[in-house]
């Protein structure tokens, strides 16, 4: 049964023809670029278990009624687009590019990438805006320290950030605006706030007056008396209230500046996001996201200035991800305890890092450890190896696609489908969605490698159908590689690097062990196996000889087994 699958790419719409049981590689390369709502509908038509459908921007199947935790209401709410049938507007606060991005950034943008993918999986059209704060005190300070132009520095680190996001398979947002390109919009919004008497000018600076905005504190739950000044600098004594924050900063020597009605200067920290979100999504839109450290003061201040500029400004869902912790302390550049994305992916496949991040619910804190990265990497290898073995056997053997699948296969597919959508629709419980793949993967391994499994009726058809459904799940989670074979080789290369060993040396050790076994020197054979296992290289004996694969280093594997 052939089907035309149309996949959206930056260059346009590229039609790809795929067969259900053959020539899959072009299809899953395409699916790695975008969550496949059309593919899911195709699958729904082919097999009854895929019967969930959505129309007019609203899901009809109960498992597909997305519920998201809204920071403002402090509860989960059913997601309803502001305007049914129109695209969903989503704004996520981006990075301040003055240094390499760390895995705290990865946590945030992987989380919102999953939300973006899942909304599209549910057939919503999404306009996703994520900004670059390329004008900021930290950028200026770092540029002065390095003797570099601030815009050159921010461009360099912005490009590095985009490379990091591509490595983590985060889909590009619809728009990625920079503050420096939107100063006119920022100035116009400040004028509106001044006209509405919610701001005041002091010596070329413009401050927002929190006393003139009674709703201040609704998002964070803070009382105004408890709030510290909402800036990244010391309190200015010229403020009417210590919590007043800068909308416009007067120019200082050696800093970039723009002309304005209040004199030369540059935007404050918070106004940029209000102006850019309004420019691209309107004053009212559906979702605003960021790390939980942005709830106050940044997002609290955004709400205040947006409403002061336009009283009808409304954002329906405020969504925030939890921190990445190191030794129970938030990972951040300011604390000096951060690990960069680039440093991690020197030793681990980028999708192992993504798997690690998805293993914890996005709102919960996640503790960064090498041991957990190793577990994620091992889990990823097992998943891709199973799917690669399945792909290989289905490509080289013919299957009869005309007959229905066995009932037990349909049950496994239906169960995965239901568990995946139920967990994802419940505030994006990615850890549960990942766990839902465990049983189908085990079934696939039985069909591939056990004598009983190989004799099962419609074995190839079952393998192919299971692989197709797991591929859809991986795509929505952003874990589908362009090639299983390439990903497996990359995982092997990273394992060798972590073990500080070459593949040639591993092969040599395998040959030494084979010779020892032939000579009945079993103690030496065991020593070689344990020596490699200690550094994360597992030896696999089979009828065709001994091969190796990455694994948890032996002490860590023993610890994991002890826990289970």
Swiss-Prot record:
A motif ('KMSKS' region) lies at residues 330-334. GO terms for cellular component: chloroplast; cytoplasm; mitochondrion. It catalyses: tRNA(Cys) + L-cysteine + ATP = L-cysteinyl-tRNA(Cys) + AMP + diphosphate. Binds 1 zinc ion per subunit. Keywords: Aminoacyl-tRNA synthetase, ATP-binding, Chloroplast, Ligase, Metal-binding, Mitochondrion, Nucleotide-binding, Plastid, Protein biosynthesis, Transit peptide, Zinc. GO terms for biological process: cysteinyl-tRNA aminoacylation; regulation of translation. GO terms for molecular function: ATP binding; cysteine-tRNA ligase activity; metal ion binding. It is found in: Plastid, Chloroplast; Mitochondrion. Nuclear genome-encoded factor required for normal assembly of chloroplast polysomes. This is Cysteine--tRNA ligase CPS1, chloroplastic/mitochondrial. It comes from Zea mays.
């Amino acid at each position: 049964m052939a089907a035309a699958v149309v996949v959206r790419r930056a260059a346009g719409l590229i039609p790809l023809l795929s067969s259900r049981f053959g020539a899959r590689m072009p299809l899953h390369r395409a699916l790695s670029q975008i969550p496949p709502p059309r593919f899911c509908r195709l699958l729904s038509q082919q097999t009854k278990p895929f019967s969930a459908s959505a129309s007019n921007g609203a899901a009809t199947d109960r498992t597909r009624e997305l519920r998201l935790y809204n920071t403002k209401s402090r509860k989960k709410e059913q997601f309803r687009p502001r305007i049914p049938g129109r695209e969903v507007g989503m704004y996520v606060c981006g990075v301040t590019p003055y240094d390499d991005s760390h895995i705290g950034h990865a946590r945030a943008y992987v989380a919102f990438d999953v939300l973006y993918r899942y909304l599209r999986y549910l057939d919503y059209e999404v306009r996703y805006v994520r900004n670059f704060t390329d004008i900021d005190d930290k950028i200026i300070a770092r540029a002065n320290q390095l003797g570099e132009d601030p815009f050159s520095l921010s461009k360099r680190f912005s490009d590095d950030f985009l490379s990091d996001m591509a490595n983590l398979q985060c889909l590009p947002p619809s728009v990625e605006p920079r503050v420096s390109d939107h100063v006119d919009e920022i100035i116009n919004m400040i004028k509106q706030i001044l006209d509405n008497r919610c701001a005041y000018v002091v010596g070329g600076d413009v401050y927002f007056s929190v006393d003139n905005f009674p709703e201040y504190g609704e998002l964070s739950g803070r009382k105004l008396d408890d709030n510290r000044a909402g800036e990244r600098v010391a309190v200015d004594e010229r403020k009417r209230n210590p919590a007043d924050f800068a909308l416009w900063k007067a120019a200082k020597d050696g800093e970039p500046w723009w002309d304005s009605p209040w004199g030369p200067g540059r935007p404050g920290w918070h106004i940029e996001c209000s102006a850019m979100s309004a420019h691209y999504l309107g004053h009212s839109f559906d979702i605003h996201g960021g790390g939980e450290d942005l709830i106050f003061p940044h997002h609290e201040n955004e709400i205040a200035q947006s409403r002061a500029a336009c009283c009808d400004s409304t954002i329906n869902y405020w969504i925030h991800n939890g921190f990445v912790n190191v030794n129970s302390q938030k990972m951040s550049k300011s604390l000096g305890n951060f690990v960069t994305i680039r440093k991690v992916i020197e030793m681990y496949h980028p999708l192992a890092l993504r798997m690690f991040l998805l293993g914890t619910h996005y709102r919960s804190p996640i503790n960064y450890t090498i041991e957990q990265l190793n577990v994620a990497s091992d889990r990823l290898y097992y998943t891709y190896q199973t799917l690669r073995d399945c792909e290989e056997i289905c490509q080289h053997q013919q299957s009869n696609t005309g007959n229905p699948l066995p009932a037990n296969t349909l049950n496994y597919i239906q169960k995965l489908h239901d568990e995946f959508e139920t967990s994802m629709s419940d505030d994006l419980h990615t850890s549960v969605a990942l766990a839902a793949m465990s049983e189908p993967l085990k079934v696939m391994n039985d069909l591939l490698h056990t004598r009983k499994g190989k004799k099962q009726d419609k074995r190839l058809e079952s393998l192919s159908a299971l692989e197709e459904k797991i591929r859809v799940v991986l795509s929505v989670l952003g874990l589908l590689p362009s090639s299983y074979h390439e990903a497996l080789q990359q995982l092997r290369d990273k394992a060798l690097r972590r073990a500080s060993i070459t593949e040639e040396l591993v092969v040599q050790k395998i040959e030494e062990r084979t010779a020892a076994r032939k000579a009945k020197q079993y103690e030496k054979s065991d020593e070689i196996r344990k020596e490699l296992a200690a550094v994360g290289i597992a030896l696999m004996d089979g009828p065709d000889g001994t091969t190796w694969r990455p694994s948890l280093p032996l002490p860590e594997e023993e610890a994991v087994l002890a826990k289970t």
